[in-house]
Amino acid sequence: MASSGLGNGVGTSRSAKGLKSSSSSVDWLTRDLAETRIRDKVETDDERDSEPDIIDGAGAEPGHVIRTTLRGRNGQSRQTVSYISEHVVGTGSFGMVFQAKCRETGEVVAIKKVLQDKRYKNRELQIMQMLDHPNAVALKHSFFSRTDNEEVYLNLVLEFVPETVNRVARSYSRTNQLMPLIYVKLYTYQICRALAYIHNSFGLCHRDIKPQNLLVNPHTHQLKICDFGSAKVLVKGEPNVSYICSRYYRAPELIFGASEYTTAIDIWSTGCVMAELLLGQPLFPGESGVDQLVEIIKVLGTPTREEIKCMNPNYTEFKFPQIKPHPWHKVFQKRLPPEAVDLLCRFFQYSPNLRCTALEACIHPLFDELRDPNTRLPNGRPLPPLFNFKPQELSGIPPEIVNRLVPEHARKQNLFMALHS
């Protein structure tokens, strides 16, 4: 389990992609790009906040008891809840995530503990309080804690999900197997559905989609996006930091230092995840910010002047060597369904405005199998909930798109759809 995305993409051999490890053009490109101002440093942006309520303690050592008070709802009195720390499941620059159990109910949760500057609002907490979706990890409640040296931490109590897509994918790689296509479809569809929700309902960009940030129930295969620590509501015309998103999944406009990017960066990252699940390893395993662009160009070919302008107008005069795109059948060294190739092509557009949206991806023919009422998991069990749409998800979507999005058998089962069909 990891209710926060931890770690970077794992290293990989490039030979499995059928790509040459070097060429004169690629070597030239690497040397020349190293002299450009492509950014590869950490930046932050935050907002002010008021003084929080704080409890003492909240250690993550096994057996440590954390007591906090929940605010009453609907006139109910405040309630004291105790959690027993079980073990740390991940650490990172943000803090740590540990598994805990509620003493009162026996429920297992994940607690994400992050260092908090009391002068600032915590954007992740604000975002988590907004979200309510079957493919986004749920926030149960939160509290602040203080250590002996007066450091203040925010503790996000999250639903427990036992696995990550990263670990599931690695379990196949270790045995030299590829993930069954039905799972690739299921995971990719659920990522797109979650992104359609946050992009369309809030203008929210996750900014760190990667296998480590995708929780999955190994029995039902329901997927939930987690770790909204980098997420932000993007406002047109307002600049954002460009050093965002883990390297292997970083859209090219970010590598070019664009600051007025869009939610299309999440779409690129989703393509990287899908390709990795199909390939068994990262598609673009760059060793640095510059090398990341080299890896992309080796597969997609050199971007045109117009494509570069769409990513960052400041680079239009830069002279790139002309490298032809690598055929997808050679990249994957196996026969992919044409629908899978088509969707990858829609994800991997240099021009952000030419990438498909998350909603468009959801209605793509690749996922028609998931809309078939007879489709089952390989073990014979039913698929996880895929079409339990809430009104907020479907708001403003034309009826003809809704009809393609929600199959007839699901509409019959859904009271909301029955009332609004």
From Swiss-Prot:
Positions of post-translational Phosphotyrosine modification: 243
UniProt cross-references to PROSITE patterns, sorted A to Z: PROTEIN_KINASE_ATP, PROTEIN_KINASE_DOM, PROTEIN_KINASE_ST
Biased composition annotated in UniProt, kind: Acidic residues: 43-54
Sequence ranges of Basic and acidic residues compositional bias: 29-42
Pfam families: Pkinase (PF00069)
Domain Protein kinase: 83-367
Species, as recorded: Arabidopsis thaliana
Organs and tissues of expression: Expressed exclusively in inflorescences.
This protein's name: Shaggy-related protein kinase kappa
UniProt cross-references to SUPFAM superfamilies, sorted A to Z: Protein kinase-like (PK-like)
CDD domains: STKc_GSK3
Domain of life: Eukaryota
Protein function: May mediate extracellular signals to regulate transcription in differentiating cells.
Reaction(s) catalysed (UniProt annotation): L-seryl-[protein] + ATP = O-phospho-L-seryl-[protein] + ADP + H(+); L-threonyl-[protein] + ATP = O-phospho-L-threonyl-[protein] + ADP + H(+)
Listed EC numbers: 2.7.11.1
Top enzyme class: transferase
Gly residues bias spans: 1-10
Active site (UniProt): 208 (proton acceptor)
